[in-house]
Amino acid sequence: MPEPGPRMNGFSLGELCWLFCCPPCPSRIAAKLAFLPPEPTYTVLAPEQRGAGASAPAPAQATAAAAAAQPAPQQPEEGAGAGPGACSLHLSERADWQYSQRELDAVEVFFSRTARDNRLGCMFVRCAPSSRYTLLFSHGNAVDLGQMCSFYIGLGSRINCNIFSYDYSGYGVSSGKPSEKNLYADIDAAWQALRTRYGVSPENIILYGQSIGTVPTVDLASRYECAAVILHSPLMSGLRVAFPDTRKTYCFDAFPSIDKISKVTSPVLVIHGTEDEVIDFSHGLAMYERCPRAVEPLWVEGAGHNDIELYAQYLERLKQFISHELPNS
């Protein structure tokens, strides 16, 4: 039996040619490396779409294209809570909902529109009405808002923060296709929706990015000042994930967060597992070292890419950072 051909960081020569030569542009490389949108685990119904039988969960196989075809929902007044005139959230079994219908009814969902004309599914979880801070949470890969909803409720209630999140273009009920340019347009639309719809000012917004979500988070934070930034398992760039020995940013690289982090003027907390098997720990360390206003990082000994939240020091560090290191008056 012939020996397999040489591989570089898990990639064969043929895979490398497919990755970088078909064609060699950042958007195509980004799409091949990074985006794994799951089958949607939720649907959003506008008020006029809710009928007598609408209380039953919508089919899990609903697609982003179907959501995009829905008529645009009426926007409640800025800061208004869920009510008869609001959109409703319906979860499939795969969302693994862990709370009661009462908590689900309190989750606010609506659509926004990006500068690239994609329809963006947005979610506001009001966990701590009296809290000063709201997290603008950019989630990781291969999940959508339906799967993250339970986590948001648990996290927000424990760190005393409200949480605003959104699905990237091509994820969940958001229309379009996932791409690097769409990532940046998506978080811009989310930022504007949080500010205008809920009246949250930049000094009360904490940008939280996890894994691929650190890419739009760093981009936005490099352009706008906010209360703080939390980078959970960040990556330096797409090429550096595939090839750890890469020392500079090439023109065909994607997600060059390492070149943007020096422009972030807000306090930055970096969190990374020392045994991360997807984005090596060296990425978190390098991002931390480039931050002009980095605070004490959280290096979780023995943690991988998807289990940092299971370690006690995760919540402890977040509470310390938000409740004691940031202004709370």
Swiss-Prot record:
Any GO BP: positive regulation of protein localization to endosome
Tree of life domain: Eukaryota
First-tier enzyme category under EC: hydrolase
Membrane-topology descriptor: Lipid-anchor
One GO MF term attached to the UniProt entry: palmitoyl-(protein) hydrolase activity
Compositional bias annotation for Low complexity: 53-79
Function: Hydrolyzes fatty acids from S-acylated cysteine residues in proteins. Has depalmitoylating activity towards NRAS and DLG4/PSD95.
Disordered: region residues: 53-85
Protein name as catalogued: Alpha/beta hydrolase domain-containing protein 17C
Entry keyword set: Cell membrane, Cell projection, Endosome, Hydrolase, Lipoprotein, Membrane, Palmitate, Postsynaptic cell membrane, Synapse
PTM annotation, UniProt: Palmitoylated on cysteine residues located in a cysteine cluster at the N-terminus which promotes membrane localization. Palmitoylation is required for post-synaptic localization and for depalmitoylating activity towards DLG4/PSD95.
Coiled coil stretches, renumbered: none
InterPro entries: AB_hydrolase_fold, Hydrolase_4
Substrates-to-products reaction catalysed: S-hexadecanoyl-L-cysteinyl-[protein] + H2O = L-cysteinyl-[protein] + hexadecanoate + H(+)
Ways its activity is controlled: Inhibited by palmostatin-B.
Active-site residues per Swiss-Prot or TrEMBL entry: 211 (charge relay system), 276 (charge relay system), 305 (charge relay system)
Enzyme Commission code: 3.1.2.22
